[in-house]
Structures are given as C-alpha cells and as structure tokens.
C-alpha cells in the first residue's frame, strides 16, 4: 500500500511540474498590423528593390567570373 502511495505522489509531482513547464501559447497577431501591411503595398516594393540592388551586382560579378574561368 505504501508503494502505491509513493507511486501516486511521484506521478502527481511529475504531472504538476509538466503542467507548469509547458510553454504558454503565442499571442495572436494583432489585426491592425495585418491590415496596415495589406494597406501599404509600397512597403513590399521597397523590400524587393533592396534585394535587387544588393543581389544583382553580386550575381553579375559571379557570371563575369564564370565566363573568365572558362
């Protein structure tokens, strides 16, 4: 009988510590932030232009090196 009580106590301690250790769910995104992102399409264009201005010269240099190598 004492063994069963000990097993039950250990189970309770493990279960309670598992409940408290569980991460809290992430908060839902604010609808205003999503609406702002959809309302301003130029923000996306700026990101695309930034990628093009930084990545395009690197791509051109890579193509030039490959042509020179053979």
UniProtKB/Swiss-Prot annotation:
One of its GO terms (biological process) is killing of cells of another organism. Keywords: Allergen, Amidation, Antimicrobial, Cytolysis, Formylation, Hemolysis, Ion transport, Membrane, Porin, Secreted, Signal, Target cell membrane, Target membrane, Toxin, Transmembrane, Transport. It is found in: Secreted; Target cell membrane. One of its GO terms (molecular function) is toxin activity. Coiled coil: none annotated. Residues 22-43 form a propeptide. Monomer (in solution and for integration into membranes), homotetramer (in solution and potentially as a toroidal pore in membranes), and potenially homomultimer (as a toroidal pore in membranes). This is Melittin-N. The gene is MELT.
